[in-house]
Amino acid sequence: MDELLLLSGNDIPFPEARVTIHQPRLREIAFIGEEAFFTGCEFLNFSKDMLQEKDKINLIHQTNFEILMSIVNDKSPLGINTKNAIFMLLTLLFPDYEIKFQEDGIFLLNKNEFVTLNKMNFDEFQKILVQMFCLNKKKDNEQDYNPGGDRAKMIAEKLKRGRQRAAAAKGEENQKIAVFSRYISILAVGETKDINSFMDYTVYQLYDEFDRFELKQNSDVYLQARLAGAQDLEEVDNWMKDIHP
């Protein structure tokens, strides 16, 4: 996807469904909260490729979308909570549409038209989400799985246990989910900006600025140390390098 389109914050074309996807601002995400946002992202981005080969056997005849629908159609409390998180995220992505869950698809309705998320276009939808929300950057402790349905629950529990071990090794297992608020706080102080100005950023814009700021800080510290006569310093990356490979 074009980096300028992502960085501009404009809506993103989703031609496979004949609709555009809104890039929500952080102030919009704040309405649903970071936990619901990351939970929704986690499940909308679910892929069998995350699993080990032995865990894929029972799912070989199901698409990623069919697995997702088995979760949102589950009536257990955990399934309902997950469905609510997905619903809230979808309302941010498609603000002009009413969201309806059916057994075979997710329908987006307004007075003029309706479009459908289904197994035919869901893979392309996931690709857009991954780039728009930089989902390949997420850390182990950013969100929890709340599965519904026996098969989906089995998948999610395996993933959750693996992540819990990684988080426990870092002493982060019980940390709250506050990724965006932390990044905003750091940038507001580090760049001497009004904290409210970041609320109009998209997720992509926030990550872009934070990564660039971090590279610039490292570069400045390195140059200051060199000028002060420090020896045997480890080289740092050029702060102007491409950060979206």
Tell where the protein language model's regions lie, with residue ranges:
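Long, intrinsically disordered, low-complexity Ser/Thr/Pro-rich regulatory/activation regions
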Residues: 226-245
